[in-house]
């Protein structure tokens, strides 16, 4: 099952973990076949939030909500179950300084013909 491990850190701790330590963690997970993707994010000040309300788009600088910890990166992993995903998350280096939110992903289940109709109507 796929799990998204969201890395949260306070701004003052964004550089508490050396890039090489995170890369070593990712390489180990990749070699084990458990890592599907991983990326660090730029600071929250570079975020842009997009909203569609009543058919109108608004774009604002910054994140959706103010928070002490900010989303600093993610690891998309393939684990047997939540327990294994938690064990993997505990080994992600920034866990020592912030938090790792572990969330299962879900598959989108739709009829392919319905997707084609929707895509045709949108273009």
Predicted regions and their residues:
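Conserved, structured core segments of small domains
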Residues: 1-123
């Amino acid at each position: 099952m796929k799990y998204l491990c969201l890395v949260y850190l306070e701004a003052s701790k964004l550089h508490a973990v050396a890039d090489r330590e995170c890369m070593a963690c990712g390489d180990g997970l990749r070699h084990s076949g458990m890592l599907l993707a991983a990326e660090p994010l730029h600071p929250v000040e570079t975020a842009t939030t997009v909203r569609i309300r009543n058919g109108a788009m608004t774009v604002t600088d910054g994140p959706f909500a103010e928070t002490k910890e900010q989303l600093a990166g993610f690891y998309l992993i393939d684990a047997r179950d939540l327990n294994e995903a938690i064990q993997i998350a505990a080994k992600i280096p920034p866990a020592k300084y912030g938090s790792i939110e572990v969330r299962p992903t879900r598959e989108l289940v739709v009829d392919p013909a319905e997707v084609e109709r929707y895509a045709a109507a949108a273009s």
